Amino acid sequence: MTSFFAEFVHTSDGVTCSDSGLMDLSTEEECSGAVNYAKTFNNNARYRWEVYGDMYPKGCFISESGNMYFNKYTGSARSSFSGISICWKGNT
């Protein structure tokens, strides 16, 4: 693992960064920059696009199929979408 990858960490399926005491990636650019890290646990990882809605996890997330998205929604509603969040390593 390179030092760049060491900056990222991912959650279990359905668990958000904040649930884990981790920091959300805050921009679409940060999320698309995490693709190589995501490929360490999902060979199909590829960044797709930005989304906005309370049905998705906040910040950067990856689906089981490998599609990665950045959710701009900042509200407090809980996600009903199953996905793995990609976070910055470190505490909030």
Model-derived features with residue positions:
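GGW-centered surface loops in extracellular recognition modules
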Residues: 4-49
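Disulfide-bonded cysteine motifs in exported proteins
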Residues: 12, 26, 55-57, 82
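Secreted/processed peptides and extracellular or luminal domains of membrane proteins
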Residues: 23, 37, 66-67, 91
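Disulfide-stabilized extracellular beta-strand modules
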Residues: 49-75
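Short, structured beta-strand segments at or near domain termini in extracellular proteins/domains
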Residues: 1-9, 78-92
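Intrinsically disordered, low-complexity segments enriched in Ser/Pro/Gly/Ala and basic residues
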Residues: 2, 11, 25, 62-64, ...
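Disulfide-rich extracellular modules and peptides
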Residues: 19, 33, 62-64, 72, ...
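Long, compositionally biased alpha-helical segments
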Residues: 22, 28-30, 73-88
